[in-house]
Every structure is written in C-alpha cells, then in structure tokens.
From Swiss-Prot:
HAMAP family: SRP54 (MF_00306). Keywords: Cytoplasm, GTP-binding, Hydrolase, Nucleotide-binding, Ribonucleoprotein, RNA-binding, Signal recognition particle. It comes from Mycoplasma genitalium (strain ATCC 33530 / DSM 19775 / NCTC 10195 / G37). This is Signal recognition particle protein. GO terms for molecular function: 7S RNA binding; ATP hydrolysis activity; GTP binding; GTPase activity.
Length: 446
C-alpha cells in the first residue's frame, strides 16, 4: 500500500536507546521528516500529514523515559495509535437496520457498479439476506446490463426501468422492494466524469425518494488529491454516511482515499481487495494501520483461511504432512483452496515486512503453482496418491507430459521438489515433538 513501510523508517533512522531522561525534538527530528516524506509520497493529504506529525511530536517530545528504554518500540506504538485515530470514525460498520436502503454514488470508473454486486454478495454471505439491485444509471446502458448480470451472479433481485426519470424508477423500485422478500435495496446511481449541478440535483431527487439509511460513495484507491474536492461536493449535497475504497488490491498508494475519513469525518466502511465478487472486506482501521507500518494483517489472512478451509480437512492434511504421508492429491486440493483465498501477491501483502517477497518472486511462485496444478491434473488418481509410481515408470511420465503439454524437465523438477518437501515435512514433524522451531528453511520450496 505504501512503498516505504513506516516501521522500516523508524528502525533505520532512530537509535534504539538514549541516555537522557526525556525525549527531545532532536531525537525524533529525522524520523518524523522521513515519515512526512513517505506519507506525502503515498498521496496522503498535506493537512492530514501535518496533523499526524504534530500529534506524534506532541506525544513524544518531552516524554519521560526509563534508562535503556527501547525508543523504536515506543515511537512505533505512538505512530500506530495516531494512524488508527486518522482512519477511525464513528459508525464504522454498515448499518444493521433491516430493511436497509443503500444509495451508492461516485465518479465514473470508480468501480461503483461492480461494488454494488460485491456488496450484495457480501451481505448474502455475512447475513444470509437477499438484496434488490436497482439500476439508475440511465445514461450508460452498459451499466444497467452489468448490474443485471451481477444480480444473477449474486442471486439478487434486479430492478430497472430503462430511461425513465430516476426519481420515478426509485419510487417504483421501493414498491417492488416491499413485496420482493428482500432485506436490502441497493440503488446504483449514475457515475460522472466530474461533479456538476445537474448530477447533484438528480442525486438529491433519488435521496428524497429513497430516504436511504446509507449513502455510500465508492472511491477509487488510485485517485489522487482531486478526489478530496469531489468527495466534499458529494458530502455537502448528500450528507454521505460512508466510503467504500475500491482497488486496494492494486499497487495504489491510496493515501488520498484514506485521507477522506479524517478530512470529512465520514467513516470508511468497506474496501475492495480483488476483482472477484468476494473481493469486498470490512474496513478495520487497526489492520490497515498494521499494513502501513509493515506489521502485516494476519487477522484478515486468518479470516480468509477460515472462509475457505474446512477445519477438519485442514487438520487432517497438516497431520498427513508432518507424518510424511501427504500425497499429490492432497497438494492439489490444498493449492486449489489457496487459490480461493486470492493471488499469492495479495496474500503476501498481509504478511509482516520481514516476511516480504518481491512482486517478481510472488509472480514466480504463482506461475510455479499453476504449473504444478497442470501437471498433477494430468496424472491419474492412483498416480497422485502414489507418486512413486511415476518415478518408477518412464511411460507414465511420457503420458503425463503429453497430456499436460509441458516439458519433461518440469515434471522431473516437480517430483524432485515434492520428494524434498516430504523429507522436510517429516523433519518438521519430529522437531514439533521436541518443541523446536520447525519452519526454518521450509519456504525455499516456493
């Protein structure tokens, strides 16, 4: 999210201990300067940066310290607290009132229509409740068609009335909503390239007709500082209740988008973390603060795993692995489940900075996993369950190569690395029994 992790700046520029009784301006001057540069480089709003730096300075300079106290840890704790303060606002979670009426607004290209579908999917998964999706973008027929497709994919009710005035369509949608056995209605309003009075008047007419519980602006995570003025215009006319930041799975610096909560005092409710329908997550200020600091987001990673893996199956697979009995069938299922959690790159971003892997290496890992899946899928079930059969029989290897369209050396590398993994897993199992650290060097296989 931010190119320069704030924790690495602190570690690099600030000495661990000082002998004085209080922290002085000089002790923190360099680190605050570099943090300021990092935040501005990430497109965080200047006013937000100034307030952030001032808050850290006020809380650290003059602070009484114990002899030998670790200043780095102390400063990181203060930075994290202030980051959470910037990102946090009251009513952070989506309104739990039912029936729930949501009005979605935003600029063209922000991912608003796609986000409507993701939100319907998120509500269904989280609350097991049905949603009605209403197409009000009468200026872009493709948007209404897209919303209809999304409604089919999310098992939602779809409503639209072509090019009818949006207020009239909203009124008709509300009538249909009352009899549709849906708990939530989401109105996808027209996106524009820029704000103007005509657009705002139209949105106000929808608001007056719908009387929404939530007015959510979808903001592109790639947006620059101009999004702040746009959001202020929307908020002035509509009184926004929240933001959804889209495209946070990209290399977006996202500083401008994340500045909105502090500047407008409006909460960020959800974030888009992938292009898939399940790529919407609740916004947790503390977790985002951890990512910015380079401390990772292990809680979100655990939640993703819990959604994908069956606990009993996972326990069984891990037990087989440590006993050296995990076969290629188990590995294939495991890789398929991992794929459901997201790309290797997106998962690595949730790990602390000291576990970081470059984008290039993440891509290599992704490619290797896809290659292995192709090769393993070209094996018979008997071969997957008894990999030694492949090494013993050249004819089996030839058949797998022919079926997969891959090269012999790629299959040989898979089998060689598989054997290494089996040996390493067995060693790990033995180390676990003795209470030693079993994970040293295991990552080399990917």
């Amino acid at each position: 999210m931010f190119k320069a992790m704030l924790s690495s700046i602190v570690m690099r520029t600030m000495q661990k201990k000082i002998n004085a009784q209080t922290i002085t301006e000089k002790d923190v001057e360099l680190v605050l300067k570099e943090i300021r540069i990092a935040l501005l480089d990430a497109d965080v709003n200047l006013l937000v940066v100034k307030n952030f730096i001032k808050a850290i300075r006020d809380k650290t300079v003059g602070q009484t310290i114990e002899p030998g106290q670790d200043l780095q840890k102390s400063l990181l704790k203060t930075i994290k607290t202030e980051l959470i303060n910037i990102l946090s606002q009251p009513n952070q979670e989506l309104n739990e009132k039912r029936p729930l009426k949501i009005m979605m607004v935003g600029l063209q290209g922000s991912g608003k229509t796609t986000t409507c579908g993701k939100l319907a999917y998120w509500l269904e998964k989280k609350y097991k409740q049905k949603t009605m999706l209403v197409g009000l973008d009468i200026y872009r027929p493709a948007a209404i068609e897209q919303l209809e497709t999304l409604s089919q994919q999310t098992n939602s009710v779809f409503f639209a009335q072509g090019t009818q005035p949006v207020a009239k369509t909203t009124k008709a949608a509300l009538s249909a909503f009352k009899t549709a056995k849906c708990q939530t209605i989401i109105c996808d309003t027209a996106g524009r390239l820029q704000t103007n009075e005509t657009l705002m008047d139209e949105l106000v007419s929808v608001k007056n007709e719908l009387n929404p519980d939530e007015i959510i602006m979808v903001v592109d995570g790639l947006s620059g500082q101009e999004i702040i003025n746009v959001a202020q215009t929307f908020h002035k006319r509509l009184k926004l209740t929240g933001f959804i930041i889209s495209k946070l799975d990209s290399d977006a610096r996202a500083g401008a988008a994340l500045s909105l909560a502090s500047l407008l005092q409006v909460p960020i409710k959800l974030i888009g973390v992938s292009e898939k329908l399940d790529g919407l997550e609740q916004f947790h200020p503390e977790r985002i603060a951890n990512r910015i600091l380079g401390l990772g987001d292990v809680m979100s990673l655990v939640e993703k795993a819990e959604q994908v893996f069956d606990k009993k199956d996972l326990t069984k697979t891990i037990s087989k692995m440590f006993l050296g009995k995990m076969d290629l069938e188990d590995l294939l299922i495991y890789m398929q489940q991992m794929h459901k959690m997201g790309s290797v790159s997106s998962l690595i971003k949730m790990l602390p900075a000291n576990f970081s892997v470059s984008e290039e290496n993440a891509e290599l890992i992704e490619n290797k996993i896809e290659l292995w899946k192709v090769l393993i899928n070209s094996m018979t079930r008997e071969e997957r369950r008894h990999p030694k059969l492949i090494n013993r029989d050249p004819n089996r290897k030839q058949r797998i190569i022919k079926g997969s369209g891959r090269k012999m050396d790629e299959l040989n590398k898979l089998m060689k690395e598989w054997n290494k993994m089996q040996l390493k897993a067995t060693e790990m199992g033995k180390l676990l029994k003795t209470g030693s650290n079993p994970f040293g060097g295991f990552g080399q296989f990917f």
